[in-house]
Amino acid sequence: MKTLLLTLVVVTIVCLDLGYTLKCHTTQFRNIETCQKWETVCFQRAVKPHPSSMIVLRGCTSSCGKGETCCATDLCNR
């Protein structure tokens, strides 16, 4: 009986994703992305492709690049 219980516990742990995954807003309006395990921060970067327009890029990343605003909690890059 103990062996069966131990086996069930091990199978449950293996089958469940016990790791925390971050969620970030994406560039597409109202979309949410579940980040990969190695992507630990959400980013937001404003890009000006034309003098009269601006695009805000959003998503998951592993490190914060130059000109990006980064944060490490769910949906923090709004």
UniProtKB/Swiss-Prot annotation:
<feature type="signal peptide">
    <location>
        <begin position="1"/>
        <end position="21"/>
    </location>
</feature>
<dbReference type="InterPro" id="IPR045860">
    <property type="entry name" value="Snake_toxin-like_sf"/>
</dbReference>
<dbReference type="GO" id="GO:0005576">
    <property type="term" value="C:extracellular region"/>
</dbReference>
<dbReference type="InterPro" id="IPR003571">
    <property type="entry name" value="Snake_3FTx"/>
</dbReference>
<comment type="similarity">
    <text>Belongs to the three-finger toxin family. Short-chain subfamily. Orphan group XVIII sub-subfamily.</text>
</comment>
<keyword id="KW-0528">Neurotoxin</keyword>
<keyword id="KW-0629">Postsynaptic neurotoxin</keyword>
<protein>
    <recommendedName>
        <fullName>Neurotoxin 3FTx-LK</fullName>
    </recommendedName>
</protein>
<keyword id="KW-0732">Signal</keyword>
<feature type="disulfide bond">
    <location>
        <begin position="24"/>
        <end position="42"/>
    </location>
</feature>
<comment type="function">
    <text>Blocks both the muscle-twitch response to nerve stimulation and the response to exogenous acetylcholine.</text>
</comment>
<dbReference type="GO" id="GO:0090729">
    <property type="term" value="F:toxin activity"/>
</dbReference>
<keyword id="KW-0964">Secreted</keyword>
<keyword id="KW-1015">Disulfide bond</keyword>
<keyword id="KW-0800">Toxin</keyword>
<feature type="disulfide bond">
    <location>
        <begin position="71"/>
        <end position="76"/>
    </location>
</feature>
<feature type="disulfide bond">
    <location>
        <begin position="64"/>
        <end position="70"/>
    </location>
</feature>
<feature type="disulfide bond">
    <location>
        <begin position="35"/>
        <end position="60"/>
    </location>
</feature>
